[in-house]
Amino acid sequence: MKYKSFLIKYGEIGVKGKNRYMFEDALMKQIRTALKDVEGKFNVSKELGRIYVDMDGDYDYEEAIDRLSKVFGIVGICPMVRIESKDYENLKVKVVEYVDAVYPYKNFTFKVDTRRADKSFPGTSESINAELGEVILNAFPEMKVNVRKPDVLIKVEIRTYINIYSVEIPGPGGMPIGTNGSAMLLLSGGIDSPVAGYMIAKRGVRVEAVYFHAPPYTSERAKRKVIELAELVSKYSGPLNLHIINFTDIQLAIYEHCPHDELTIIMRRYMMKLAERIAVENGDQALITGESIGQVASQTIQSLLTTDAAATLPVFRPLIGFDKQEIVEISEKIGTYETSIQPYEDCCTIFVAKHPVTKPVLENIERSEEKLEGIIDELMEKAMETKERILVKA
């Protein structure tokens, strides 16, 4: 069946009270953006607590569904038939046509669920359920009614128009992008950070990203891998700016002047400082990392506290309590896993100490960083001046 309309269901937005319209408008904007490059003409509208997407002429159904299923704020996409006439007899004809078109095999149980928002329509919801159920049974005797656990729930909404639907394609949930500020993601080539970006974007935060590149120790292919990961995240987050920092000279200075068991912590602290500078320049309110407690030596509570002390912006760690397998499952779900496991080194995996400190003391780390005085500031400025910015979109 070629559907001409979708009903868009949303979750948390519906309980936003007086600000609900702002979230609805933000969601509609994201829907329009998602469908912008899809073949066909789409009209997005809202009416009485419902958001609709109506198609004018031919369109790419599969592509439209794929794009909508990645829009944060949507919990369900219901392909539907819209009937402009509110003639009761016409409704009976249309509901039979709908069942026949959508379900070629009729050996299933069903239930009709009517919502009569327009109280001028004759009858009650219960009486309409019964009459439409009878009409369907007369047309298709092999079908059976089951009001407790039907195989198919046929929904009829009587509003300005009459909507008929029975299929709900799940969306990602969450909040529309841009309704909760913006933040800077420290993006590496691993499994965790793309998932962290996805998780924060799901809460309505507009995400930017920074990647620390260390040529010749990291290859151009490693850089390309991170760009690919950013593109995959942007399928959900929308277009994002990816800032690329050349971190080589800073890493070499740290390696040359600081204790080797503190290399990872000190490098992470300077990454945080640079990420914060870029975030502030771009008006972001927080930093995002993919760390979780205890996963590696640099992710003990003491290490995370020491890393946080390098920045003044809040640091969001949406994966903090996740097991690795849980993170892997999300990465597989959002399509980043296969790219993340490609064997290209990033700057977090070179110059790694054999026995890194796991319980760093901030005062000791700051004392070690004093050995970089007269060197590091100039290198930081050079890194900022030579940074690259790419607008990434799926």
What does each model-identified segment do?
Residues G190:
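Conserved G/P- and acidic residue-centered "switch" motifs that form tight phosphate/ATP-binding loops
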Residues M1-M184, P194-N241, A309, V357-L362, ...:
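RNA-binding accessory domains that recognize and position tRNA/RNA substrates
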Residues A230-E256, D346-C347:
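A conserved beta-strand->alpha-helix junction
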Residues Q295, P343-F351:
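Small/polar glycine-rich anion-binding or flexible loop at a beta-alpha turn
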Residues E134-I136, G173-N180, Q251-L252, E256-E329, ...:
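Active-site adenylate/phosphate-handling loop in enzymes that bind or generate adenylated species
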Residues L185, A209-Y211, I244, T289, ...:
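Structural beta-sheet core signal
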Residues G335-P343:
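A short alpha-helix-loop-beta-strand transition element characteristic
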